[in-house]
């Protein structure tokens, strides 16, 4: 944490510690769940059957309507946490992606994620996955290959990039409803609107 708070004093330092503390707590909880579910470590089959993988940009708010399920993101600990701790922590995975033939001008964020999938380093957990095309076309490029590496049914949610335009609202809502139906079909759980609104 010190690297991210260098030079801070007083209120600014306290706020940074509070914010980073929340991130650390969240990541530790997520890693604990991943380790429990991973067949190579904890092999908790019951937990695994209740996990829905979301990519790092997928709106986790959606899972408020599935109180009996757990959402996890395998990209967050593998790519984002490691690069927060060490800026060159994911360079190897970016190189793997380039060696695969992806141009080097693709954003390093989705390139690193794709590299983890290509190197077969993601834990194989969950009963299904939902991915979205944000934040950029680089994410869209890697999602299909990542989905194959997860070896579970995966839904690709296509978010309109110009999401504030009136002309895309109906389509965007339809995509979210399709994702909900996909999760229902894969898990046997029904979306609970009361739980959803309570969680917001």
Locate each region found by the language model:
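An N-terminal assembly and electron-transfer interface module characteristic of large anaerobic redox
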Residues: 1-200
């Amino acid at each position: 944490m010190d690297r991210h708070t260098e030079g801070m004093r007083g209120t600014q330092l306290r706020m940074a510690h509070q914010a980073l503390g929340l991130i650390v707590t969240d990541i530790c909880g997520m890693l604990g769940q991943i380790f429990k579910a991973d067949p190579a470590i904890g092999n908790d089959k019951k937990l695994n059957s209740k996990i829905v993988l979301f990519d790092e940009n997928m709106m986790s708010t959606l899972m408020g309507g599935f109180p009996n399920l757990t959402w996890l993101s395998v990209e967050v600990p593998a790519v984002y946490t490691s690069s927060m701790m060490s800026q060159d922590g994911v360079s190897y995975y970016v190189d793997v992606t380039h060696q695969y033939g992806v141009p080097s001008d693709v954003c390093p964020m989705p390139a690193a994620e794709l590299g983890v999938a290509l190197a077969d380093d993601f834990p194989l957990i969950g009963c299904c996955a939902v991915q979205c095309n944000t934040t950029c076309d680089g994410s869209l490029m890697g999602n299909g290959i990542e989905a194959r590496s997860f070896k579970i049914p995966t839904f690709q949610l296509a978010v309109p990039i110009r999401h504030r335009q009136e002309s895309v609202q109906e389509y965007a809502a339809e995509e979210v409803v399709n994702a909900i139906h996909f999760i229902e079909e894969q898990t046997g759980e029904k979306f609970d609107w009361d739980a959803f609104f309570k969680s917001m």
